[in-house]
């Protein structure tokens, strides 16, 4: 049994992950500021601590509890917010991460699992499916901070010997996904279809994404939590894309969901968004 801290564990993916750690017998603490997470998402059996990852008390918690594993899902993940307020994005995604990393280093945490994003760190890659070794060309401050987080993890590994792994998610969907935010097009489209409302597509809808089910993402997290690796020589040695390798256009996704919901397809097209 391991003692596991899941940051962002009241959110969409983090709460499923907290469930999974509990089910396999781990002791789980969920840390979340509830800005986007929901208290009811925290599974029974997990201890809940309401804190922001930038708060000094989050670091104190890590030093006091001596976790075996930290799975870091808390983040500012709205691309549009990162474009309009890059300082805030960096404050959460870099300053918050460093608060945890310094405490983890001092507490000698065994494994740090970091959530990155394959959807933003590569930019518009030429090769698809995109390998982990592809050039990193983020096109938004959010992508920059996610890639920066990976570099910080690699630094702590190289200099301090911290064991870590980075998961570069594609577009995750599934139960508990927020249908009201900027991310989560599957949940957004599904909710609007069931309400009989039109779908808004930004751009021409021919842009493609890789959509992966949250249960598969959880399975990847568990496998990589337990995996052992040789000492890393480069950034991509400890980074893993998590997706299906299948491209789906936004237009095709809208049509598929409309068919599954047995609703008419009514799409309104809007200008493409910056950083998306």
Question: Predicted segments — roles?
Answer:
Residues 124, 136, 141, 178, ...:
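Active-site "substrate specificity/gating" loop of NAD(P)-dependent dehydrogenases
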Residues 52, 194-276:
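C-terminal substrate-binding subdomain of Rossmann-fold SDR/epimerase-dehydratase oxidoreductases
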Residues 74, 104, 181, 193-194, ...:
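Hydrophobic aliphatic residues
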Residues 68, 80, 87, 98, ...:
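Residues in well-ordered alpha-helical elements
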Residues 84, 92-95, 133, 140, ...:
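Residue-level signal for the nucleotide or nucleotide-sugar donor/cofactor binding architecture
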